UniProtKB/Swiss-Prot annotation:
Summary of the function given for this chain in its UniProt record: Bifunctional serine/threonine kinase and phosphorylase involved in the regulation of the phosphoenolpyruvate synthase (PEPS) by catalyzing its phosphorylation/dephosphorylation.
Source organism phylogeny: Bacteria, Pseudomonadati, Pseudomonadota, Gammaproteobacteria, Enterobacterales
UniProt entry keywords in alphabetical sequence: Kinase, Nucleotide-binding, Serine/threonine-protein kinase, Transferase
Residue sites binding ADP per the record: 157-164
Protein name: Putative phosphoenolpyruvate synthase regulatory protein
MF terms in GO: ADP binding; ATP binding; phosphotransferase activity, phosphate group as acceptor; protein serine/threonine kinase activity
EC number: 2.7.11.33, 2.7.4.28
Recorded family membership: Belongs to the pyruvate, phosphate/water dikinase regulatory protein family. PSRP subfamily.
Organism (species): Klebsiella pneumoniae subsp. pneumoniae (strain ATCC 700721 / MGH 78578)
KW Nucleus (keyword) present: no
Main enzyme class: transferase
Amino acid sequence: MESAVDRHVFYISDGTAITAEVLGHAVMSQFPVAISSVTLPFVENISRARAVKEQIDAICQQTGIRPLVFYSIVIPEIRDIILQSEGFCQDIVQALVAPLQQELNLDPTPVAHRTHGLNPGNLIKYDARIAAIDYTLAHDDGISLRNLDQAQVILLGVSRCGKTPTSLYLAMQYGIRAANYPFIADDMDNLVLPASLKPLQHKMFGLTINPERLAAIREERRENSRYASLRQCRMEVTEVEALYRKNKIPCLNSTNYSVEEIATKIMDIMGLNRRMY
């Protein structure tokens, strides 16, 4: 049974709402509260702002509890309309800007879409991120072994241990060119590093996973198959972990970590530079 919703939460912005959503979610994660959230980006005109206000007010009337509103809005007229709503409104950016304004002795120059928008100042970084995503997609799951020397990290692991989502997160969030290579059941009789990968051992990072968790994930994909059996999963994990130890490849058990946590740990262990976009 799903837990009851304790509070309704709105993440609102005149831009992408990514900042409001990420910071608001980080704040809400500190409280043992079940939430139902709505993200409303590009609230850029009066009519849309009024519609959002009505949506907030309707929830308040239905539940008798003020919705929580995390907003990042540059346009004063839009911000004023949201503040007139029945929600508990928090400007998550201004809470940081005000003390910084004092410390820097500078007035802020707020511009909508500056954080995640495309502008002349970040075109080079944007192009680099797109190139990283293209590279990562082209080198997913061992599709291509060409130009592997251009990878910043090469993830290794058995099927369904988290290589693809982690690679894509590294590319999309940080502009990291991440290749990944799978070890499949047919490899297990004589598991060795492919000759094409050996010269790039310094770029390799291994992922592993608890066999029980791996079996559960595989069962959803191929029910009642040898591929998903606990015995097969145990054998594959054992062989791959032995390979990591033999070749001194750094590794991480992904079982209890989110994609974000896995990616961050990989970057830290491999000494990869963060690039924020």
